[in-house]
Amino acid sequence: MKELIIGSHVSFQRKTQLVGSVKEAVSYRANTFMFYTGAPQNTARYPIDDKLTQEGYQLMEENGIDPVDVVVHAPYIINLANTAKPDNHRFAIQFLREEMDRCAKLGMTRLVLHPGSHVSQTREEGIQNIIDGLNQVLTTEESTYICLETMAGKGTEIGNLDELKQIIEGVEHSEYLKVCIDTCHLNDAGYDMTKFDDFLNEFDEKIGIDRIGCVHVNDSKNVCGAHKDRHENIGLGTLGFDTLYKIVTHPKLKDVPKILETPYVTKEDNAKEKVYPPYRFEIDMFRNGKYDPELLEHIRDFYK
C-alpha cells in the first residue's frame, strides 16, 4: 500500500521562506505541507527568494517530500463572489493572479481558494461573479491548479457540491480547477462524514472524483449541519478519530495530499493562549492507525 501523504499547515517566513517551511514539516514527521506565501489576512507580500527556493527543494528531496504534493493556500481576503464594490472585485482578481504567479515561481502546483461570500448579492449572482473572476484569472497555460475549497455554509459562503459543480461548469479553462475537501467544513455544511463512501459517490456523480486535489483533515467542534466552521483536534470533536482515519486512508484518495489545520494546543486545560502545534502527534496517530487518548498531555510534555 502506498505511504500516506500527510502533513499540516506550516509557516512561510520572510527570512527563511521555503527552507523554513520544509524544516517545520520535517519536524512534524510529515511528507507534505501547506503554506501561505504571505499573511493570509492582508496583501503584504515580499519577493520569492530563488536561492531559498532551491535550498527548500534540496531539503524536500533529502526528506522524501514530493513537491507535487505540496499545497499553497490563497489568502482569505480574496472574495470573488461579491461585486458590490467593483474595485474590490478587480483587486481580488488581480491578487489571485499574483498568487498564481508566485506559485509558479515556487514550482507549486496546488493553490487552495475559498470560493467567497456573496454578502449583499444573491447566491446566483455570487456564483456568476466567481465564474467571471476565474475566467479572468485562468489562461490557456497554467502550471498551478486552483483547488476550490468546500465551505461550511457560514453566513453567505458559497462552496457546497452543487455550487462548486456550477462554478466548474461555467469556467472556460476548468481543466485547471480542482476541489479541496475539508472534513470539518463538509460536516458543518450537512454532509455525513460517517458515510464517506456515499459522499464520494455524490461527489463523483456531480463533479468527478479525479477533481479532488487536496483534503483538509480537521475534526469539528459542531454537529453535522451547524454551518459554523470551528476546527477541533483529531479525535476530540464530533467526527472522531475512526471516521477521519477512514477518510485519510481511503483507497480512492491515496494519491491526494492530506493537510491538517487543527488548532494549536494550550499549555494547560483552562489556559486561553494556544501555543503548541499538534501536528507531529496527529500525524503519528494516522500513520499508526491508533487514537491516542492522552493526545493533549503528550503534546504538552513534548514541547514544554
Model regions and ranges:
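N-terminal pre-domain/capping segments
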Residues: 1-72, 80-98, 289-304
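Hydrophobic faces of well-ordered beta-strands that scaffold small-molecule active sites
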Residues: 4-10, 31-35, 68-74, 111-113, ...
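Active-site beta-loop-alpha junctions enriched in small/polar residues
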Residues: 9-13, 38-40, 75-77, 116-118, ...
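A short, acidic, flexible beta-alpha connecting loop/helix-capping segment that sits on the rim
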Residues: 13, 259-277, 302-303
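Active-site acidic/histidine proton-transfer and metal-coordination neighborhood
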Residues: 16, 61, 79-178
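Acidic (Asp/Glu)-rich catalytic clusters
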Residues: 22-29, 49-71, 97-107, 135-142, ...
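Short, electropositive alpha-helical surface patch
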Residues: 86-98, 123-136, 160-170, 197-201, ...
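Acidic/histidine-rich catalytic cores of soluble enzymes
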Residues: 131-234
